[in-house]
Regions:
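Switch/coupling subdomain of P-loop NTPase systems
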Residues: 1-37, 95-97, 106
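Residue-level signal for secondary-structure boundary sites
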Residues: 4, 57, 83-85
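Hydrophobic face of alpha-helices
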Residues: 7, 25, 46, 124-125, ...
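Short amphipathic alpha-helical coiled-coil/interface segments
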Residues: 10-13, 46, 313
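Charged, surface-exposed helical/loop "interaction arms" that form contiguous linear patches used
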Residues: 16-70
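ATPase nucleotide-binding head domains, primarily ABC-like/P-loop NTPase cores
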Residues: 62-63, 70-311
Length: 313
């Protein structure tokens, strides 16, 4: 009986406490009601202040700056770094290789080629993320002398978008994205496309990619595109407004340098990589004979040009 009475007393006290809290809150509400507008303005000001503080803290964390911003589309970046990759590598005691890239009205499409795992996709994602950060009003990890513009539209095609529900293959999904990009492309659009034309038979895939690339060029769209296709590299050399870029590779150490060099197409280093991982030499010889000496020699000459350019620079 005593336990029951004690429990009832506790419940009564808890209910009394809740009633008292409600009374206090009502009283406070009555006191502040005449100042509601001032309080809302103060709340908004504090939110803005916190946003500024968060931006400063974020900028310090990623090494971000407020670059020179132009009222027209332009990408003229030095020391650009992917912020997430930068933080991840710093934890491992490593450093990001900075990206230098320039696109303007005269040179508005960049075709990046080079070996797999050489940094092509990282370059693409770095451009996309930094540009989006800027347009969200955030500091960006680039050199202080970098110049950045504003794009009205950004479109991205990266990764495998195969859909079971929509019955779309990887290539079909890729083509659907290309179709939408052709519709939206204009001189204030930035397109980011990874492995352009991939996912299908190389001959028709490369031809389709070249035909679509011609439309982007005609519409003066800005674009950063990665590819292995030779015809797209030739397209860049033959058309104004389009430029090749190569991901550099150390042929002696057989490792990627993760540096983008604009002006020359890159090699896929297929023969060198196959030899490095131990593919039998007779298999490599057969592959070389099948593809033709001219193709292999052209790839070798391309490597020599890139090497010589690096030496003289």
């Amino acid at each position: 009986q005593e336990v029951v009475e004690a429990n009832n007393r506790i419940r009564e006290l808890e209910a009394e406490e809740k009633r008292e809290i409600i009374q206090i809150l009502k009283h406070i509400t009555m006191l502040i009601r005449p100042n509601t507008k001032e309080l809302l303005r103060a709340f908004s000001f504090l939110a803005d202040l916190e946003f500024v503080r968060a931006r400063v803290s974020f900028a310090k964390h990623i090494g971000g700056v407020c670059p020179n911003v132009a009222p027209y589309p332009i990408i003229d970046w030095t020391l650009a770094q992917h912020p997430l990759l930068k933080l991840s590598l710093e934890k491992q005691g490593k450093k990001v290789v900075p990206l230098e890239i320039k696109l303007d009205r005269k040179q508005h499409i960049l075709i990046i080629s080079g070996p797999n795992a050489g940094g092509k996709s990282v370059c693409l994602k770095t451009v996309g993320l930094i540009q989006y950060m800027l347009q969200c009003g955030l500091p960006v990890p680039v050199g202080e002398n970098s110049k950045m513009g504003i794009f009205n539209k950004l479109a991205i095609d990266i990764g495998d978008e195969q859909s079971i529900e929509d019955d779309l293959s990887t290539y079909s999904s890729h083509l659907l994205n290309m179709k939408n990009m052709m519709k939206m492309a204009d001189s204030s659009t930035l397109l980011l496309i990874d492995e352009f034309g991939g996912g299908t038979e190389p001959t028709i895939g490369g031809a389709m990619a070249e035909a679509i690339l011609m439309r982007y060029t005609q519409k003066s769209a800005f674009a950063v595109i990665t590819t292995h296709y030779q015809n797209l590299k030739h397209f860049a050399d033959a058309h104004d407004g389009v430029v090749n870029g190569a991901m550099l590779y150390d042929r002696h150490q057989m490792q990627a340098l993760f540096q983008l060099q604009i002006g020359n197409p890159g090699s896929s280093f297929a023969i060198e990589i196959a030899r490095k991982i131990g593919i039998p030499e007779e298999v490599i010889t057969d592959a070389t004979n099948l593809v033709g000496k001219d193709y292999v020699n052209a790839d070798k000459y391309l490597l020599d040009i890139v090497r010589d350019k690096r030496y003289w620079e």
